[in-house]
Each structure stands twice: as structure tokens, then as C-alpha cells.
């Protein structure tokens, strides 16, 4: 039996490049509160973005259920993610720093900075604010952002289909895409009520991309 902890330096994510480190029980040491917290935050964040868990190969074992889920792109889903960040920042502020090595201190600082920046972005009543990713945009859906692009890429490029359980997970995600589109539509409508509409040239690119993806 192995003890699994997410790589501390890679916890920043989206925690976009998170990885699992394993150590034999004979050499296992009790992780510091900081390491335990970063590991917990990484898994909680991956629960908000199950597709990332699949891309990283982490939707296995106790986390296998993530393989059949998609992130919540509705206004309620965005608010839940914002609350997670707010709570996480409190937890990060409380974790003891005394005696930590420079690598761990750096991991905490980078994670805290990324979470704070994302939290500030999510406080805005429109757009997409990511955690540790470049895909920030004032629009809920645009030519390079949205379920219309992300779900097909996930299912075609990263979703394993090796057995019946995998096939069921694939179908579950395919069905859940409709819910994602509804959530994004609600955010687009809310942004429009605020007068936030993409310029025509971006709409043209987005519509062309959507059209090409279904032809």
C-alpha cells in the first residue's frame, strides 16, 4: 500500500500541473500541516474541474467518479468556486510557516497568490477568472473559451474508453454538456443585461468555430 500526496510545487493549478508522489510505507514520514493542506486544496480544486483530473490521469481509485463528471459552469458553480477560494485563503493564512523549507514556503506563496488573484477576478460580475491558467476573459463564452470547445477536446483527446465503466463515464459527460451549455447561457444573458457583449469580430470567430465543430 502506498501513501499518495499531490506534488507541492505543482499544487497551483487550475492546480494545472498537479501530480501524485508515492512513497513506500517503510520510508513514509508524517507530512507537515502545510503539505497536508496543499494536498487537500489540490483535490478539492480538482473536484471543481473533473476534466483536469482526467487530463492528469488522477481520476482513478478513490477518485474514479470524477471521470464521469464535468465542471459546473453556471452562476451557482462560479459562486461555489469563489467561496472555495475564500475559505482556502483563510486556511493558507493559518498554516504554520515555522521550520518549513524554501520549496514549501514557495509553494504556499505561489498558491496563495494564485488563489487571491483568481478570487479577485471572480468577484467581477462577468467573464471567466481561472486559477493558475491563462484563459481569463471578460466573456463567459468566446472563440477559445467555453464548453463548446472544452468538452469535445476532453472527450476526443483525454477521455479513456477501455471498459464498460469508462463508456458509462463518457456518456455521462456527453449528457452533462447540455447542463454546461445552459449554465453558460445564463451567464451570457446576465452579462448582456450589463451591456457586456463581445465585439462583432470575436462573435464571428466564435460562431465559425462552433459551426465548424458540428459540420
Task: Locate the predicted segments by residue.
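N-terminal maturation segment of proteins
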Residues: 27-215
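N-terminal export signals
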Residues: 2-4, 10-28
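Short, flexible active-site loop motifs that bind/organize anionic cofactors or intermediates
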Residues: 1-2, 95
